[in-house]
UniProtKB/Swiss-Prot annotation:
Comp. bias (Low complexity): 128-141
Record InterPro entries: DUF4529
Domain of life: Eukaryota
The protein, known as: Uncharacterized protein C16orf46 homolog
Taxonomic placement: Eukaryota, Metazoa, Chordata, Craniata, Vertebrata
Region ranges (Disordered): 1-30, 114-144, 262-289, 341-360
Listed Basic and acidic residues bias regions: 262-271
Acidic residues compositional bias, start-end: 10-26
Length: 383
């Protein structure tokens, strides 16, 4: 029992000794004045003071205007450096002073020119202007006079205008005249060709510069019509030839082939030209009004077709168009008689006859309705 108690007491003493040794080995902050406990608090207070000063400076910098920072270094430059533009010096023109690039001088020159009323004597004003500018600045010292003579330009020219402004003014004047002439034409609708031609020539020539060029001659327009009609006729012929034979077509239309080669004559081409839409030849008064009124030409030019341009003036052209219309009417009648003669017949009882008649039904249906083929379904019986 005694041995156990001694061992326990020895263990407790050893633990106490270890605790004391660890407390002694802990680092302690020592101050030169000998204040070890207050050293940590003093360091924290110093850090807080430094951060406070920095925060105050930052707030002052944000709230302040920054004028002091901007003014730093101004003593090294000239006092008028902020007024002068940063550009290369240009050569002085005739009639301008040496300091024409100075903004203050230019503004003062503009104001002096605006306040002075314009006079008729051009060269006299130029000669008198240097003496006026020299006599204007009267100061106690000669330096101010010399500065005024150098800085202020003697004469500033403002007579130049850009080309765009001139063109715009010219166009507005022309259109104003054309509007007035149009109003006169509307008030007098019964006026003939002589009234339409009373508008001066230069106005019409200027107005027609805006329009696209007219065709050179009427024969060219008729050639264009002939080419269009030929193309449409060839397309229709190709569609019809894919259904029926050439010989039956020639007999039904009443056409004849030259030399048996299938070449169509001009009379045959004339049958299928579309001439119903061609207007009658307008009067010369209408032509002159179209040419003399520039606004109508500009607004409605895109609506005019090539058929309107092809206005036949000679009697031979009128006869040619009338003959084309008659030939077209005859061709339509031949079409009608052909389709009435080829009505579908009642089908035959045999199956072969039904198969032979089915493509004929297709042909008649294609042409009686608008040019779209109708679909048919053939049923085959399984034997």
């Amino acid at each position: 029992m005694d041995l156990c108690q001694k061992n326990e007491t020895d263990l407790e003493n050893g633990e106490n000794n270890e605790i004391q040794s660890t407390e002694e080995t802990e680092p302690t902050c020592t101050c030169p004045d000998g204040r070890s406990e207050k050293n940590h608090v003093c360091c924290l207070l110093d850090i807080s003071d430094i951060t406070l000063e920095q925060d105050v400076k930052a707030e002052e910098f944000i709230i302040g205007t920054g004028w002091e920072e901007a003014v730093q270094g101004w003593g090294r430059t000239s006092p008028a450096a902020c007024i002068w533009p940063r550009k290369l010096p240009k050569k002085a023109r005739v009639g301008e002073g040496a300091c024409s690039d100075c903004l203050v001088c230019l503004n003062l020159a503009h104001r002096s020119l605006e306040t002075k009323p314009p006079t008729e004597g051009g060269p006299e004003k130029d000669q008198s202007s240097p003496s006026q500018t020299q006599a204007a600045p009267q100061g106690p010292s000669t330096a101010s006079r010399a500065i005024s003579n150098i800085c202020f330009p003697t004469y500033f020219r403002t007579e130049k205008k850009s080309l765009q402004i001139k063109e715009f003014i010219w166009c507005t004047e022309d259109w104003a005249i054309s509007d007035s002439s149009r109003g006169k034409a509307l008030r007098n609708p019964s006026g003939g060709a002589h009234r339409g031609l009373s508008i001066p020539g230069p106005l019409t020539s200027r107005a027609l510069l805006v329009l696209p060029p007219l065709k050179a001659s009427l024969s060219n327009a008729l050639d264009v019509l002939g080419k269009k009609s030929k193309n449409s006729f060839l397309q229709s012929e190709e569609k019809v030839l894919s259904v029926e034979k050439d010989g039956c077509l020639a007999c039904a239309y009443g056409l004849k082939t030259a030399d048996g080669k299938g070449e169509k004559r001009p009379s045959e081409l004339a049958k299928h030209t579309v001439v119903n839409d061609t207007p009658s030849s307008p009067s010369p008064a209408a032509r002159t009004s179209l040419l003399t009124d520039p606004e109508q030409c500009c607004l409605h030019w895109s609506l005019l077709s090539e058929k309107n341009l092809a206005c036949p003036s000679d009697s031979s052209n009128v006869r040619y168009l009338a003959a084309l219309q008659l030939l077209q009417k005859r061709g339509v009648q031949n079409y009608k008689s052909k389709f009435q003669a080829k009505d579908p017949r009642p089908p035959v009882i045999t199956q072969k006859a039904k198969q032979e008649n089915s493509p004929q039904m297709l042909e008649t249906k294609v042409f009686t309705r608008p040019l779209l083929p109708s679909l048919t379904h053939r049923k085959k019986k399984i034997k």
